């Protein structure tokens, strides 16, 4: 079931890592500039980082960056997140109106998924988990805040059905795209993607401490892997 990680550009590792780091730096810098210049609401700048940072998995996949590099990078990013909680060095990473360790969990989830699935030769499942979190959760938050009219509560956290539906749709589309790329577009792919989407929305509904930034990517990646192994492999 593995996918060959061929580097089409045959770049040395240090250049590949440098390109990925440059991309992440550009994402954070853009968000910081928007935040410091007050050109966009604080929550929007956070979601720019949230969505933008997740795309690094595609760069790592395309450039065949080894899993161990991703694991180390995840630990390094987690360290920066912890430091940013102590010192206001990157306000664009801070949660708005709530105490959260979401950035820390997000960095750890990327490190775990890239380190694990890339090392197994299964980068597609790392991509699914990370991009479900990036696009699903990121868009759900923005849609819920802007257009959320129908509210409900889960363990004291207010959610909107509009945001939850966005999470389901984005997660479904991400999973369908990547599974279809690998296994072809089939009914089973739709079933697996639907399972991932519903489970991801359920995991996202419990977001105390920002733990959904860990449970959503790990859960969606593992469900996609298990479903593919059982029904598509």
UniProtKB/Swiss-Prot annotation:
Major location category of this protein: membrane
InterPro entries for this protein: Dgk1-like (IPR037997)
Presence of the UniProt keyword Transmembrane in the record: yes
Protein transport listed as a keyword: no
MF-aspect GO terms: ATP-dependent diacylglycerol kinase activity; nucleotide binding; phytol kinase activity
Compartment(s): Cell membrane
Disulfide bond positions: none
Mutant lacking the gene: phenotype: Cells lacking this gene show a reduction in tocopherol levels by 50% or more, and an accumulation of free phytol. When measuring the kinetics of chlorophyll labeling after adding 13C, the mutant cells show a similar rate of chlorophyll synthesis and degradation as the wild type, but show a reduced rate of accumulation of chlorophyll containing labeled porphyrin/unlabeled phytyl (13Por12Phy).
Chain ranges passing through the membrane: 9-29, 56-76, 96-118, 122-144, 172-192, 213-233
Topology with respect to the bilayer: Multi-pass membrane protein
Any one GO biological process: phytol metabolic process
Keywords: Cell membrane, Kinase, Membrane, Nucleotide-binding, Transferase, Transmembrane, Transmembrane helix
Coiled coil: none
Highest taxon listed in the record's lineage: Bacteria
UniProt pathway annotation: Cofactor biosynthesis; tocopherol biosynthesis
Documented EC number(s): 2.7.1.182
Reactions listed under catalytic activity: phytol + CTP = phytyl phosphate + CDP + H(+)
Function noted in UniProt: Catalyzes the CTP-dependent phosphorylation of phytol to phytylmonophosphate (PMP). Can also use UTP as an alternative phosphate donor, but not ATP or GTP. Is involved in tocopherol biosynthesis, via the utilization of phytol generated by chlorophyll degradation. Also plays a significant but not critical role in the recycling of phytol for the biosynthesis of new chlorophyll molecules.
Similarity comment text for this entry: Belongs to the polyprenol kinase family.
Name listed for the protein in its UniProt record: Phytol kinase
Organism, scientific name: Synechocystis sp. (strain ATCC 27184 / PCC 6803 / Kazusa)
